């Protein structure tokens, strides 16, 4: 009789400990230059966050655009031009908002404008204008793009790195080494 209870107890313990799933942690911090470097994305770079999204037809899609520098190679910059391409057969652009990083010391909205061709490309221009500083440096949030789904499917939003640029206050171009779209 004890052997039956012993076997049942053994099977119960085996079931409890054998059914545990160990998950691999995936960290998707867009401004983590070390994680970007491990993926072969050099700094400075432009990244989107979140990396992937699943939404229903009634949801909106919020995508943040970030600039990432390494701690030892931060260059001061004053303006950024981003050209972002997206699948207009799946999503439509709704709203573009300035990011918090490029606001001035008075926390006012930066010079922030965009052009949109009602197709699949949007150009964002943002400039740091401040009374105390000419440039800013660091890693941060440049813009938020809000899209609405128009049909189902999967595709990517990406930077056209050939058209993206970053400049200092003297209008000198700063090399962008990579993107993480």
Name these PLM-found stretches.
Residues 20-181:
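Acidic, low-complexity intrinsically disordered segments
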């Amino acid at each position: 009789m004890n052997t039956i209870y012993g076997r049942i107890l053994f099977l119960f313990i085996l079931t409890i400990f054998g059914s545990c799933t160990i998950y691999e942690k995936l960290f998707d911090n867009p401004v983590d230059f070390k994680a970007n470097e491990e993926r072969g994305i050099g700094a400075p770079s432009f990244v989107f966050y979140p990396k992937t999204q699943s939404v229903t037809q009634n949801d909106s899609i919020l995508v943040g655009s970030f600039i990432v520098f390494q701690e030892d190679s931060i260059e001061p910059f004053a303006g950024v031009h981003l050209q972002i391409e997206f699948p207009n057969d799946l999503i439509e652009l709704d709203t573009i908002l300035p990011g918090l990083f490029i606001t001035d010391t008075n926390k006012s909205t930066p010079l922030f404008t965009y052009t949109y061709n009602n197709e699949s490309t949007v150009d964002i221009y943002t400039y740091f204008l401040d009374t105390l500083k000419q440039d800013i440096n660091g890693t941060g949030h440049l813009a938020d793009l809000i899209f609405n789904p128009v049909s189902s499917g999967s595709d990517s939003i990406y930077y056209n790195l050939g058209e993206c640029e970053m400049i200092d206050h003297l209008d000198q171009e700063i090399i962008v080494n990579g993107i993480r779209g």
